[in-house]
Amino acid sequence: MLVRISEIEVVSQSVDEYQRILGEEAEASVRLEPGVLCIFPSAQRGNPTQIRILEIYANRDAYNAHIRSPHFQKYKTSTLDMVKSLRLVDMQAMDAKAMPLIFKKMGGQP
């Protein structure tokens, strides 16, 4: 399993458009890619230029397939001028066995 947090700062004039494009990409990734377990974007409360994305992939191959996908490439090229900074932080799941229980508990809830 590969777990990553993307820390993104967006140009303030582009926040709405960036969030729209990111939302489309996240939905397509989870729907179309079996190895993408989670793409969960969030904006910092009170500071929407600060975006964090929790990304969970089945493995490194799933991640590599994801970044080559047409929807990710469209997202990347469409938002290039909107991103002020990007930091990718690889994480180590402390209890990977509990993760499926979290998603099961969600039971399709929004």
Enumerate the predicted regions with their spans.
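N-terminal first-folded block
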Residues: 2-41
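Residue-level signal for secondary-structure boundary sites
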Residues: 14-16, 61, 96
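Short, well-ordered beta-strand segments in beta-rich or mixed alpha/beta enzyme
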Residues: 2-9, 38-67, 105, 109
